[in-house]
Amino acid sequence: MAALLVRGCALRPSWATRSAPICARGEGMKGNFAESVCLGCTSLRLLNYRNACFRSCTAARPVYVASRKGDNEFLWTDISERRYYKYLSSPASWTALKMGPWDLSVRNLHLSRPLFDDSVVEKSLKSLKDKNKKLEEGGPVYSPVSEVETVKKSLGQKVIDEIKHYYHGFRLLWIDTKIAARMLRQILNGHAMSRRERRQFLRICADLFRLVPFLVFVIVPFMEFLLPVALKLFPNMLPSTFETFSKKEERLKKELRVKLELAKFLQDTIEEIALRNKAAKGDVTAEFATFFQKIRSTGERPSNEEIVRFSKLFEDELTLDNLTRPQLVALCKLLELQSIGTNNFLRFQLTMKLRSIKADDKLIADEGLDSLTVTELQAACRARGMRALGVTEDRLKEQLKQWLELHLDQEIPTSLLLLSRALYLPDTLSPADQLKTTLQTLPESVAKEAQVKVAAVECEKVDNKTKLEATLQEEEAIRKENQEKEMERLADAAKESQQVAAKVDVQSAPEEAISGEMKTATADTAAEPAVAQMSASEQAEILKDTAPVLEGIKGEEITKEEIDILSDACTKLKEQKKLLTKEKEELSELKDDVQEYSEDLQEIKKELSKTGQEKVLQETKASKILTKRVNRMIGQMDKIISELENEEKVLDEHIEKGSVPPVGENLVSINELISIMRHIQKIPEQKLQRIAAALDENKDGKIDLDDVAKVVELIDKEDIDISTSQVAEIMELLQKEEKLAEKEKAKEKVEKEQAAEAQN
């Protein structure tokens, strides 16, 4: 930890990477955001911010309306008309403002998994292939664990262990049920959920289906059957600002949206509970516990094989979510990112940077190290926290080659590799020793999460006590995050109130100036002798602030409110153009996930057949039932999309020709986007131009609505203020990742075709 603190204080000169950095160097960032996301990785948050100009009432945020209770609160009235209150100084001074559903909208329901994330089934398949590969090479699958004499338990001890097992199991079931009910209530009320909450909700649903498999037969059909009723009773689940020509079209779009998100969430749940190992005895979890104990307590050095094997479990998201603030600051300084701000803000920067490094690593591996110039090698090494100046070209290539081997070949997470650099470890240490030292600095909270993860990957059971501890630990982290967000919100509200009060004082100043002019003159006259009596030294001690006031990047900054306006603008443009491209794309991705899941199961059976264990690992009954349900929902959604397209064709015949853009046209001009945003809320013209220019990457005056939606989702996920240059960099990163994903899909397709030809 001391090394991390020293590293965090080190000052580094600015540098330029080969690819555009995610957070611009030298640009100030507020860092005052709350990590407010919905159930999914990203979410279009359709929220309009309205300034109420009554007395000193400031901007009210509808997202807090339905969640806060107590004396000082915002309130909803009914569906057709909404009323909210802004607390001023006492309940007697509350000011009310009425708004209809056309003014206020809510966040979109979203339950899908983050992009570019391997499922548990895919990780299990990789682990199985790794084992078989080592067996074929003739080496041991894993390092032998130190043998411990098995002590035969007495009958009384067996009874006590069984009682403890069921006690922790029922307690876990009760806590999971409470948490699931609370989160489901938040979803129905239209509230967004953080990444941590979404991950917790997914794991809890998987645990509930494991503990009580009968729930699959009851909950899923019942939930699907009641979707129309839920949309009627809880309109805040989806935005109510559809500009449709038909009530039927609006109903179908809402039904499609909810079915799509539910199907994606069920598919994620399937992959969590897919496989069960009948012969599992908990050996892997015991090995991990022994490994972590060696590192943290005994000081005994594990084997290199164990270090590399278990280091893969500490994924970037898991590691960043559990790092302390000094460690987050040290990583930001190492990567020369903004190191001032909340923990969530620092995590967002690091997440974007790690994604950028991962994409660059794949590009460098494809192009080869020899294709890089010396300047590019220096920039690449420096971007990864390695020495870049005063080093020969061969040394630069060697450093980068070792990084690529650890990251891409051995699949060591980028966060661990960067943490090892932040510790200023000697270059003479081997990569395994560097990883060992890095794992020693990780908080204890990571161990429980990693232990649950290793059991899921190896398809083994985790004892109920460990699951319960991990669940309670995650709940405590969620509670702390919510407290941070609430404190930040109160600080922002207090700042706004002070600004409003200052404006009121400025307006009332001229009235008091005349009456106080004579008093001021008299006071100044009386004070002149006292000032004259002050010595020269006393006058010299009076401090005067002569520094100029810096405006920073205020003109270039996009606030959270403007991100919401941009989100609304994208939605309205899509409604005007009658686009279903986003829904079609997500449905296509869901079909691909289902197909990949089926192919992974077949590959797992094939790998198990090599060792004669194909009957040991089986698909659970719950996952089979859910798979059938998801396939059925996919068929229903295909019918809804066809019905919507037919409805739009009929409606277009009754509308004047040329008034509606052609269906499927996904490009809009910059002027269209600016016009819609100007209509939603007044924003300075120059700022509108800069926002639109940041979204127009190729500078042709056209913007792809789907690309804009993806950028907005990613930014809105963290609820931050961000500069226009950073928006452009995020768009570039997303497009780079999409190109890499297309290359990987094409490569996999070719490999499958070659394998099929070889079999024939």
Swiss-Prot record:
Residues 1-117 form a transit peptide. Residues 254-555 form the Letm1 RBD domain. Residues 683-718 form the EF-hand domain. It holds the Pfam family LETM1_RBD. It catalyses: Ca(2+)(in) + 2 H(+)(out) = Ca(2+)(out) + 2 H(+)(in); K(+)(in) + H(+)(out) = K(+)(out) + H(+)(in). Ca(2+) binds at D696, N698, D700, K702, D707. GO terms for biological process: calcium export from the mitochondrion; calcium ion transport; inner mitochondrial membrane organization; mitochondrial calcium ion homeostasis; mitochondrial calcium ion transmembrane transport; potassium ion transport; protein hexamerization; protein homooligomerization. The chain crosses the membrane at residues 211-231. Keywords: Antiport, Calcium, Calcium transport, Coiled coil, Ion transport, Membrane, Metal-binding, Mitochondrion, Mitochondrion inner membrane, Potassium, Potassium transport, Transit peptide, Transmembrane, Transmembrane helix, Transport. SUPFAM superfamilies: EF-hand. It is found in: Mitochondrion inner membrane. It comes from the Eukaryota. Residues 232-760 are mitochondrial matrix. It is a single-pass membrane protein. Residues 463-505, 557-657, 723-760 form a coiled coil. Residues 118-210 are mitochondrial intermembrane. Plays an important role in maintenance of mitochondrial morphology and in mediating either calcium or potassium/proton antiport. Mediates proton-dependent calcium efflux from mitochondrion. Also functions as an electroneutral mitochondrial proton/potassium exchanger. Required for the maintenance of the tubular shape and cristae organization. Homohexamer. This is Mitochondrial proton/calcium exchanger protein. It comes from Xenopus tropicalis. The lineage of its organism: Eukaryota, Metazoa, Chordata, Craniata, Vertebrata.
